[in-house]
């Protein structure tokens, strides 16, 4: 199976430094061309990529089965296996996500602001591509297509480094993307998959490849993200943990609370938007706590709770302090009764990860306070935490979720993969 850049020859390179430096230089050159690519050409390429992914489904699934088998033999967790596994529906969803990106408005060249100075200068702020985006991911093979498509749409070049778990699948998807690029005449190096499993390649990407990489996006476990944040010499869009809360406040409808809670926790337990902690307001604990805990247990979710939660069902096991700061990524949730909105917000501030947190209530004033005061990238009112997703936000797809405060926050889609420049129009003005 060829790597994404079929003509590069990088797969035969003996010297990793030379290999990665070459990838960086080629990406930088491709990025300059991509920044000027017409919107129509980019969209044609994306649609061709989606078509080729569908045509290559059998190959992608065959390679994915090999990856899954190897991961199972290596004793990987159920959560990792779930993120790694593709089926016909998931491959179709990957292609559809690429098409959705194609249908989005072009984020490049938009006038973000315009104003005139007293001296007659006309100043515009215009959106432009970031340049070269490095994406380092582990067990999510769909990131290959999502990241490549988003970078392409935003006029960037992408360097993709797949983890060992998903390398075969990523290579198969990458080959399909290469075909789409070739059909439309865009640079073959606009999207490159690093053709090695050598982990030292990650370290080289984090240096910026001699000024060729403008931003790094890690998609993977805590150890990967910690390493990237600690070692990167370029800006990073990332989140460390997804410790998401569902707070059942006073005024919550029990039926809605049950439905939203179960979706937040159990729809997919291994994603970063899955709820990890249930907070129930003391004002509704008598009516809501027991049925909510029973619903979780009956759905196959283990519950670790405080004394009040343990008291409603003998199957609840004690929670310790570490549980409030644990991203389980499994069918496990911690649960606690809190004394009012202030206590809920304080608990989230002390133990959360600034990712996604939800309040369930019909009290609009309480909801407004929660949405305003909880310092997370995404806060929801009467909606599942699992809406923390670029596709659900209408972004077509996402390259990741960012919880930092610089530039991108929340789902990172095409708009977040641009920056801006100022265009200054004069008529001969000079500065006194």
UniProtKB/Swiss-Prot annotation:
Xref: Pfam families: Aldedh
The domain of life is Bacteria
Q: What PROSITE patterns does this protein's entry cite?
A: PROA
Respond yes or no to whether keyword tRNA processing is given for this record: no
Q: What EC number(s) is this enzyme filed under?
A: 1.2.1.41
Its subcellular locations are: Cytoplasm
Catalytically driven reaction(s): L-glutamate 5-semialdehyde + phosphate + NADP(+) = L-glutamyl 5-phosphate + NADPH + H(+)
Task: Write out the GO cellular component annotations.
Answer: cytoplasm
SUPFAM superfamilies tied to this protein: ALDH-like
Record pathway: Amino-acid biosynthesis; L-proline biosynthesis; L-glutamate 5-semialdehyde from L-glutamate: step 2/2
Q: Name the UniProt key words of this record, in alphabetical order.
A: Amino-acid biosynthesis, Cytoplasm, NADP, Oxidoreductase, Proline biosynthesis
Q: Which Gene3D superfamilies match?
A: Aldehyde Dehydrogenase, Chain A, domain 1, Aldehyde Dehydrogenase, Chain A, domain 2
Annotated InterPro entries: Ald_DH/histidinol_DH, Ald_DH_C, Ald_DH_N, Aldehyde_DH_dom, G-glutamylP_reductase_CS, Glu-5-SA_DH, GPR_dom
Q: Which GO terms describe its molecular function?
A: glutamate-5-semialdehyde dehydrogenase activity; NADP binding
Q: Would the keyword 4Fe-4S turn up in this protein's UniProt record?
A: no
- Identify its protein family: Belongs to the gamma-glutamyl phosphate reductase family.
In UniProt terms, what function does this protein have? Catalyzes the NADPH-dependent reduction of L-glutamate 5-phosphate into L-glutamate 5-semialdehyde and phosphate. The product spontaneously undergoes cyclization to form 1-pyrroline-5-carboxylate.
Q: Which NCBIfam families match?
A: PRK00197.1 (NF001221), proA (TIGR00407)
Q: What is this protein called?
A: Gamma-glutamyl phosphate reductase
**Organism of this sequence:** Methylorubrum populi (strain ATCC BAA-705 / NCIMB 13946 / BJ001)
Q: Which gene encodes it?
A: proA
